[in-house]
Amino acid sequence: MELERNCMLYIYSSRGDAPSTAELQKKIESPNEATKAEGMQDLIIGMTQGEAYTRLLMTVIRYAMPSKDKRVKKLTQLYLEIVGKCRPDGSLKEEMILICNALRNDLMSPNEYVRGSTLRLLSKIRQFKVLEPLVEAILQNLTHRHSYVRRNAVMCVYSIVKNFGLDAIPATIDQIEQMLLSEGDLTTKRNAFLVLVHCASKRAIQFILQQRSEDGTGGLGFLLSSGDLFQLALLELLRKVCRQKQQQKAGLLRLIVSILPNTLPSVAYEGACSLLALSRAPVSLKAAAGAFASLLCGNSDNNVKLIVLDRLQECVQRASRRTMEEFVIDLLRGLQTPSLEVRRKILDLVLQIVGKNSVEQLLNVLKRELLRTAEPEQLTVPRTMEYRRLLIKAVHSCCTRFPEAAASVVNVLIDFPGDPDVTTATEVAVVVRELVATCVHLRSRIISRVVDAFPDSAHARVLRVSLWMLGEFCEDSELLDSFLTAVYAACSPLPFTSGDSGGAEGEQRSGCQPKLKMTTRTVVLEDGTYGTEDVYESVNEKGDSSAKAGKTALRKFILGGDFLLASTVAVTCAKLILKTSDEVHAQLAEEFERHREAVQEKAGRRTLTGDAQARETLLERQELEGKVAPVKLRASTEQKTRVLYLVACLLKFLRLSSSGAGAHSDAAIRVCQSLRALCGLMTGLEKEKAFVRHWVHHGRFALERVLALGPVSDDPFTWNLKDAEDEKTVSAPDDLAFFRQLRPDRQSLMVASEGVAAVGEDSLEEDEIYYSACAGLARGAELEEVDETEADLQLTVGGAGGTSPSLSGGNAKDDAALFQQRLAKVQPITGQADPLYVEAFLQVNQFDLLVEMLVVNRTQDSLQNVTVEPSTHGDLKLVERPAPVSLAPGQQAVLHAPIKVRSTEAGIILGYVTFSRRGSSDKECLVLNELHIDVLDYIERRWTCELAFRSMWAEFEWENKIHVNTSFTDVSEFLEHLMKMTNLTVVGFRPPASVMRRLKFSAACAGLDEAERAAGDGEEDEDRYLQSVRKIPTLRKLSESSSFFAVNLYSRSIFGEDALVNVSIEKLPGGKLAGSIRIRSRTQGIALSLGDRITVVQRGLTK
């Protein structure tokens, strides 16, 4: 039978026993067509289930094939498809002559359906002796009047030529080509062209070129009139020919470009993908990007949009920014979709290609979208707040890169600090602070708006940022007077008292006695479980809570225990009053002049040394131009007295507060310093003047260090954009150039890695470094250009974190070191004295884990049926069990067990191995040692900002608390080792530019659809990052001069699970470190796994 070659159906039969041959013969010979059809159906079902029924072939030929009933005819053709046509010796059965005659009659039938279905049957037959007498009839159907017959005739001809060669039908190509010129049915034309593509690609190319020369439109009219199916077949031909014949590539690519604007979406997508895979010319990439942009705006399906955005991301990586900049507005039209993920990817793409020519248009669109999110009807739309935060981050990125364009969005941004969403308001406040520091031409305008919006601020951090901005950059006496008046009014009535809680004391004085109201709320306990707590709140007689009875948000926060805000109010007011002094103004002017001279000297050294890659901050350039200079402010005696009284009231409130502030708290000390500065200004004491000089001068330079240290946005693209442009690695003229293709020990490395990882596919862009805010490209394997990459050898040594040494460049390590690194990961899982010695190597490749086991026969006997039976514990799934092997004495074998990893939950691989000795029927069994999955293999080094960290910390529910227990006595060494062993990064601190440039598209190499992938590439990058962490001033000062140390860390697993870590350490008098490490995550698995990892790491530390 033909079941092994062609079986188009398998129907389950509920009958217990298969019908006998006699029963089926009786039904088939019946004159009733329904009975005959039932018999044919039972015959086909029986044959597909293994019954032979060889004696019924002649019965079917005599009684079923001549039938005119459509159902019987169709069942007969299905029978002919599966029936055996040859004898056991391979010769054709005699009955096939009768079948050929019947098939010929069907090919000449006046019924078009019979002809078409017969042609479909013949395309599935693989015996040429059956087809040979029917070739003439098949070719005659190529010119049949009905398209259904011609369509199937073309596919039948293609099947014959494909299986038996062109010699089976010598004139096939000529007839197909003539058919293409006169065919009107689009599907038939597409089938005919496919025959030329697969059987005679040269003739297909000649046909296309001939149409281009004969058509006045360059072949475009012919192609557009041929339909989308024909165009898809043409694209398949062009991809095939362009890779084989480079001399014709340019003309064929122009043909693809010409058909993109006027085709259906399917053709446009395939054509753009073809251009992307075949060419890197700017014209081709621009045409492909234009087609993708049209598809993005013209489709409503979010899945289509995401796929198109992945392709656009690939265009961005291959093309220059100037080439892609013209598509900024086209991409922004896609923001009309309600999908937040689509919007995020669009904004990421736009931020990568925006330039000076398009930034104004981009900011106008972002401003319009921001205003639209503030409309009342938009507040009910899901995830509107998240979309607003994305827009604000995009505006921040544009303003950071193009400060001259920030004027158009300042007014809109300043309206958002009063937003009810604390994350959005804080993000806007930080953006405005940076604009004030960097955009001198907008400073007075921004400060004026900040003063007006100050009373509307409803969040403590927004108030602190606003106060700091006004204290540093308020350069107008009228604004100073307005601001000080607003602050004094917001803090009134004075003085503060420790018993005052949002107006409760005032109510008591007025005779309105407050009552206590108990509220029960749900909280998350330390162990991650839920609990409840009772909160008592004072309520007045009108039913309003005391917290809501306060006049202003500023007073409410101060009375509620926000002592940092209280100290900020005191410092800001004192600093502004100090700037009104002639002596302080002269000191500030002298300090700025000295700083400007230092900047000029530094710039001169850069010019002399020719260090064109050195970077000057925008603030330094403005100081060189003389745009940043201290301004003399004026304040009335009444304002000075008010400020002194306010600061004194704040100090008294902090010292007498029962909420834990006290006289020795940081906030109280800072307020006391403000009071000393004001007293020094008014009393004129020389000791106090020296304190004022030290206290006032360095605030603005602190902001510069903050802006240089870390990002204010969690958009990774804004972190490394300037670094990637300005801080390029320059090689010395005498540096050696390494070529991977000329390495002498390449073969030895391949031998060392044999059986572990095959050479994979990747783009030819291995020598260029790409990074995107939207990681994870959906790349078509059939369209990718194939080359060997270093990522394959990186995966060979195991680990998703990327710890393998680089194989190219001046820092390339020996292949022997790479082999030693892999050898160190081998773990024995049986003993040396056991009959079978088994050792395992865990090769991690993203979501897959391959257990490679070396099995060695240590006995002098032959061992048969050696079977390793692995099993898994945790979120692991065994994909395939190793096959049994037989081992001679001393022989060894390598077995593989692929395992699918679904999460970072701690997993264990265990099992046993069974075998039997020759001549013995008893089976022996050895229990294997456990293999623990290292969570570090699935945790990547990622970066995030403080705002995103706080938002996730408040949102995540699972928490794992670990007590610090280590022999380290130096905090910085402990932190460095902890980060190195867990792939954690410092929150809010961006990596060096050299690390960011080496971040690759790991999604393109691993085939993942994940967004924002960033992992350190190699041990050198890891060391470079850890060295940069040591230089963070705040961490260095804490570790050197403080007995308490706290830092936030972050990482993400390859499964997209965020891990938030808070390290709080206290240095005891004896030098021992104590404290806790808190881990929070959205899921329980990564919190527990990372906690176990940290516990093992810190316990195993030795100084």
UniProtKB/Swiss-Prot annotation:
Q: Which InterPro entries match?
A: ARM-like (IPR011989), ARM-type_fold (IPR016024), Clathrin/coatomer_adapt-like_N (IPR002553), Coatomer_bsu_C (IPR011710), COPB1 (IPR016460), COPB1_appendage_platform_dom (IPR029446)
Instruction: Give the membrane topology.
Output: Peripheral membrane protein
Q: Which Pfam families match?
A: Adaptin_N (PF01602), Coatamer_beta_C (PF07718), Coatomer_b_Cpla (PF14806)
Tell me where the HEAT repeats sit in this chain.
51-89, 94-129, 130-166, 247-284, 322-359, 365-404, 405-441
* Listed GO biological process terms: endoplasmic reticulum to Golgi vesicle-mediated transport; intra-Golgi vesicle-mediated transport; intracellular protein transport
Q: Looking at the keywords, is Transport present?
A: yes
Q: Where in the cell is it found?
A: Cytoplasm; Golgi apparatus membrane; Cytoplasmic vesicle, COPI-coated vesicle membrane
Major subcellular location class? cytoplasm
Tell me the protein's name. Answer: Coatomer subunit beta
